[in-house]
């Protein structure tokens, strides 16, 4: 599948511009551009070659929901996908390893077929000049550990996670130089243990359909264990592998660009509370060795306490911060007092109400183009946490899953070029941001809404047993940008590009 544009389109890409113009070469030397997937969302082959269920398999199967049993079938089509990455011009590709494929029971024997798959995939990437960025945990711990001792609510998982990380470092570290231990630690914790809408589906909040859990305590226990597991794996890498392999180990979190819903002082204060709970909860331990004072005051005894040794181990344990960013949120202060609330949870502790900045409704929507939100996040981290190295590990916008309509994904291009420009502006303002990954490289099983909408640069025909891939307009645009054939497009240029794409597709 050739990823080329007509001479007319290239001409338009150069000259149909508006506003400030930039191209890939404006970014600092060494800055990387890539795209991303995750194991459960891309691989499929859910019961092949020794893989056992993860919590995602159980969560979706027991609820009779759409699932990732086959999804994009990356397990069988990875060589084809690497060719597409090369044609697109990616510097790097971010993916995750399925813990239950590599070590099916979560600890103990390594699955040789799972090990060989990841070796083959990584070798395929490296041999084609694509830098692998690997995430160890993307919401999908083995169901065996959940059944045995409760998974992340039990500190026993720290030892098992460290042993799993050791296998990955040992087997793949000669090719992998960038490791992210935990994906979106804050959202994994909130979704799985406060709201119960993602695995393992634990909660106690009123109106939630959970059979077990405690939203007052478990989000904080799990968050604590995630931080300790990261610190343990990071320490292992530095002691055993760093000198030989020369890689780095980071941690990622979900971020929002917060803005007050009114000009009131209460809403201004609420924005800072939201930042403390969304950012500070995970970042302050890495920088200062402890949780934000606001969280300690509000959550009180329900918030775990770091021992002196744990504080020292967590502080400074993340070589970089991975940022997952999609949209902005309008924040309103609420008056709920956790001390008098009958059932406090993460949201009542935070004391804010948030309105997501989206276009359309939540069943089929696109995110609003709000690049200021990206700038706000990067500036806040720079100012508040010592300007650590940052990789934007996910950024993108969904569109309704429609094979014909989504090929001409003009709104996605408008979104991406605005956010890439925001990253460049932040770098020029001093942010130590070193890479940017579009979510997602192709259409996948999306973890909350399944196959209702898609983020991919490439479409996947999920009705076709061969899972045929096709480039969308955004794939052509990103490829041209990466190859230095284009600059950021103005709206007129994008619309003309769409028209030209339609003409070439029908000819």
Swiss-Prot record:
Top-rank taxon of the source lineage equals Eukaryota
One of this protein's GO BP terms? carbohydrate metabolic process
Which UniProt keywords are listed?
Disulfide bond, Glycoprotein, Glycosidase, Hydrolase, Signal
Q: Which residues bind a beta-D-glucoside?
A: 41, 138, 183-184, 326, 394, 439, 455
What glycosylation sites does the entry record? 64, 209, 214, 361, 429, 461, 485, 500
Q: Write out the GO MF terms.
A: beta-glucosidase activity
Q: Which cysteine-cysteine pairs are annotated as disulfide bonds in the entry?
A: 203-210
Pfam families under this entry? Glyco_hydro_1
Show which residues constitute the signal peptide.
Answer: 1-23
Q: Where is the active site?
A: 184 (proton donor), 394 (nucleophile)
Q: What class of enzyme is it?
A: hydrolase
Q: Which SUPFAM superfamilies match?
A: (Trans)glycosidases
Q: Does the keyword Signal apply?
A: yes
Report the catalytic activity.
Hydrolysis of terminal, non-reducing beta-D-glucosyl residues with release of beta-D-glucose
Which EC number(s) does the record attach to this protein?
A: 3.2.1.21
Q: Matching Gene3D superfamilies, A to Z?
A: Glycosidases
User: Which InterPro entries does this chain map to?
Assistant: Glyco_hydro_1 (IPR001360), Glyco_hydro_1_N_CS (IPR033132), Glycoside_hydrolase_SF (IPR017853)
Protein family membership: Belongs to the glycosyl hydrolase 1 family.
Q: What is this protein called?
A: Beta-glucosidase 3
């Amino acid at each position: 599948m050739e990823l080329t544009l007509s001479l007319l389109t290239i001409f338009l890409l150069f000259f149909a511009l508006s506003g400030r113009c930039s191209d890939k070469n404006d970014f600092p030397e060494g800055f990387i551009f890539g795209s991303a997937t995750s194991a459960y969302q891309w691989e499929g082959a859910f019961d092949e070659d020794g893989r056992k269920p993860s919590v995602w398999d159980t969560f979706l199967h027991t609820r009779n929901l759409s699932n990732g049993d086959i999804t994009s079938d990356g397990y069988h089509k990875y060589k084809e996908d690497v060719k597409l990455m090369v044609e697109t011009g990616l510097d790097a590709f971010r993916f995750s390893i399925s813990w239950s494929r590599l070590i099916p029971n979560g600890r103990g024997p390594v699955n040789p077929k799972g090990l060989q798959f990841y070796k083959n995939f990584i070798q395929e990437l490296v041999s084609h000049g694509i830098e692998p960025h690997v995430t160890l945990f993307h919401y999908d711990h083995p169901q065996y550990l959940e059944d045995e001792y409760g998974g992340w609510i039990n500190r026993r998982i720290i030892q098992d996670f460290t042993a799993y990380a050791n296998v990955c470092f040992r087997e793949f570290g000669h090719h992998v130089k960038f490791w992210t231990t935990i994906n979106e630690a804050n959202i994994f914790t909130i979704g799985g243990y406060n709201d119960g809408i993602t695995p393992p589906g634990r909660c106690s909040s009123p109106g939630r359909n959970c059979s077990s859990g405690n939203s007052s305590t478990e989000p904080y226990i799990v968050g604590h264990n995630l931080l300790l597991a990261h610190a343990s794996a990071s320490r292992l890498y530095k002691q055993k592998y760093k000198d030989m392999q020369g890689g780095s180990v980071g941690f990622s979190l979900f971020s929002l660009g917060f803005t007050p819903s009114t000009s009131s002082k209460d809403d201004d204060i609420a924005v800072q509370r939201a930042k403390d709970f969304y950012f500070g909860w995970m970042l302050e331990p890495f920088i200062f060795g402890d949780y934000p004072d606001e969280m300690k005051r509000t959550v009180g005894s329900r918030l775990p306490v770091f021992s002196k040794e744990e504080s020292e181990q967590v502080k400074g344990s993340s070589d970089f911060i991975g940022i997952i960013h999609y949209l902005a949120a309008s924040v309103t202060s609420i008056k709920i007092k956790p001390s008098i609330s009958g059932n406090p949870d993460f949201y009542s502790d935070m004391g804010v109400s948030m309105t997501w900045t989206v276009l359309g409704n939540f069943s089929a929507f696109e995110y609003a183009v709000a690049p200021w939100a990206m700038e706000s996040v990067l500036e806040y981290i720079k100012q508040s946490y010592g300007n650590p190295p940052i990789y934007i590990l996910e950024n993108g916008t969904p569109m309704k899953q429609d094979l014909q309509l989504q090929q001409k994904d003009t709104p996605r291009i408008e979104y991406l070029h605005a956010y890439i420009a925001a990253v460049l502006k932040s770098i020029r303002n001093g942010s130590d941001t070193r890479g940017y990954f579009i979510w997602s490289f192709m259409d996948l099983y999306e973890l909350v809404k399944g196959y209702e909408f898609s983020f991919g640069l490439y479409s996947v025909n999920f009705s076709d047993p061969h899972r045929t891939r096709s480039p969308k307009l955004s794939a052509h645009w990103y490829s041209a940008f990466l190859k230095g054939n284009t600059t950021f497009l103005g709206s007129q240029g994008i619309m003309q590009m769409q028209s030209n794409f339609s003409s070439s597709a029908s000819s």
